[in-house]
Amino acid sequence: YAAAEKPLSVDDIQLGLVEISQRSGAPAAKEAADGDTGMPALRTRRTDLHGRTPNQVAYLRDITTHDITFGIGPAGTGKTYLAVACAVDALERDAVKRIVLVRPAVEAGERLGFLPGDLAQKVDPYLRPLYDALYDLMGFDKVAKLFERTTIEVAPLAYMRGRTLNHSFIILD
């Protein structure tokens, strides 16, 4: 805890950035340029799914090789879509028993009570990007069946405290 109280210096940050770029950026850039990412094909309805940029290649590799992966980037870079694709792949391979999609149910300064309807109707607009990715990767009918069986679950972040999430692929978007 003592180290947490000490502020980071500019040199520490620079060294960290250099180390990160040497570890993940350079190999991913070469692989993406060659068109060979070394990634096995993801099992989804889309057969052409792969990382299109060096960062996407590194992101997919990190998701498939680590238990926890953080994806940070601007809107439209594929963070949610690629994470959902990896979750669908893990479910199809029986590596996980369910997919739990979590998203904050409100925008900054809003409250759920302001929207009409029950909880599902209130959070639905905020979860639309996750639904869109699922429908594209699995098809509407299959997604509907998996929702009925609670193999795929969508939950607001506020309701996740105290949950047991064994054998689950969790995407916090």
Residue ranges of each PLM-predicted region?
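Interdomain "pre-motor" coupling segment immediately N-terminal to P-loop NTPase/helicase cores
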Residues: 1-36
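Conserved glycine(s) of the Walker
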Residues: 78
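Conserved P-loop
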Residues: 81-150
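Conserved RecA-like ASCE ATPase "motif II neighborhood" in helicase/translocase motors
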Residues: 150-171
